[in-house]
Amino acid sequence: NNYYSILAQAKDTNDSVRFKYEDAYRKVTSGTKGGSSDQLGMYWQLHLAYDDGYNFKTYEDYGEQRKNLIFARIDSYARDISRAPAPDGVKLTLDGADKDNKLMRLACAAAEKNVLEFFTRWGMIPDAVTRKYAEQFDAEERTIYYINDEARAYRAEGGSSIAESVEVAATAHQDETDPGRVT
């Protein structure tokens, strides 16, 4: 699996992964449906968003792995769906789902968040069962489809978002001689 090889090679910098973030950002802003040749970036971003330890961190036992690694939880729920959270009583089911919908459901369970916006940005289309399962979780408010290694390293080192303290002001004027022009 390419995810594990990138995990072994990545050094918490954007230039140490085997895909280009520019290509990932192009995909998540394109509105296109369907898979991407940069899908490794999608899996990697889930790791970046939900795993707090550094890439080289090892854990003493499977319980610690499940607690700290999203793909350990995804694997656990794929093997035993009865372990998956169901806060509003909607149980996880994988029956009849295609591979994309299985992944979306498992990721929602593992993150305990509705992460469908993330997958939609990556071109996946959730079915009705996936939407119903995901809707019982709070929506992921972070734009995790923009996360990169350096942002995660910043978070791991105790950094926090400055978004709440930043104010942005802009002024626009319509050109009187050319109404289609705004400056």
State the predicted function of each range:
Residues 4-7, 46-49, 118:
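Generic, well-ordered alpha-helical scaffold segments in large soluble proteins
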Residues 1-30:
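Zinc-dependent metallopeptidase catalytic helix centered on the HExxH motif
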Residues 95-183:
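Beta/coil-rich, acidic/histidine-enriched accessory regions frequently appended to metallopeptidases
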Residues 2-5, 40, 104, 116:
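Extracytoplasmic/secreted envelope proteins and their assembly/folding machinery
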Residues 22-102, 108-111, 124, 140-141:
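Non-catalytic carbohydrate-binding regions of carbohydrate-active enzymes
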